[in-house]
Amino acid sequence: MKKNLFWIAILAFVWSCSPSEQELFDEGLRLMEAEEYQKAIEYFDRVLEKNPENTSAYNAKGVALFQQTKYDAAISSFTKSIEKDSSSYKPFFNRGNAYLEKKAFREAVLDYNTANGLDQSQIDIYYNRGLALLGLEQYEDAIFDFDVVLQGNPDNSLAQFNKAKAQLGNNDPVGAVESLFNTVILDKRNGAAYYLLGVTQMSAFGQKEDGCANLKMALNLGFREAKSWVDDFCQE
């Protein structure tokens, strides 16, 4: 009897020392912040061993896999999170991001639409959906999403730049030039923006002097695609 009590006491001690589900999850998040993604995944798997219904652990594991560029595995993990609980925008948004990286733009838009329906206050959804719509060449819808982003933050240089690309695709060089000017004012190191600005000024408006100045700026910033334009059109 004493021996049995001894083993019961030992087991109780072991169980009391075992980390809880929340402690394991929190450690996984800490490892994520430290960019130790594989170790984080191991902790999220331990959470799921304790509780296979933990939707947050599936979502967090998916984020860690995404950071490792394991997009298919990330999509699988986000899908499991959604299957457990479809009331949060996060796994839909995150799965959309994985589809975006895979250039599966249509699937990305569907997930972003669902995420947006669950929480319309998340500006990142509009920006990333704009990128996916740009990839689908749905330029007017992309412009709408980038405008929503810019209403909240007019100084978002990437939103200005991608709006310009959508405007060019939508055959609006006037609007594109305005957005590109806004871009280079906000980010003077964006060689691609100077390049697009220069090309548009020259090809759409015949502004050779201004266009060449911007193409040369793009080249100076290391944007090599500008070289052929500078060589062909900007030599004195």
Predicted regions and their residues:
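Bacterial Sec-dependent N-terminal signal peptides
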Residues: 1-27
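Terminal, low-structured helical/coil segments at or just beyond the last alpha-helical repeat
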Residues: 17, 23, 195, 199-236
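Helix-start (N-cap) detector for alpha-helical repeat units in TPR-like alpha-solenoids
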Residues: 21-22, 55-56, 89-90, 123-124, ...
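Alpha-helical segment of the N-proximal tetratricopeptide repeat
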Residues: 22-56, 60-63, 67, 97
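Structural signature of tandem alpha-helical TPR/SEL1-like repeats
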Residues: 34-42, 68-80, 102-114, 135-148, ...
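Structural marker of alpha-solenoid helical repeat scaffolds
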Residues: 50, 84, 118, 152, ...
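Canonical tetratricopeptide repeat
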Residues: 60-63, 67, 94, 128-131, ...
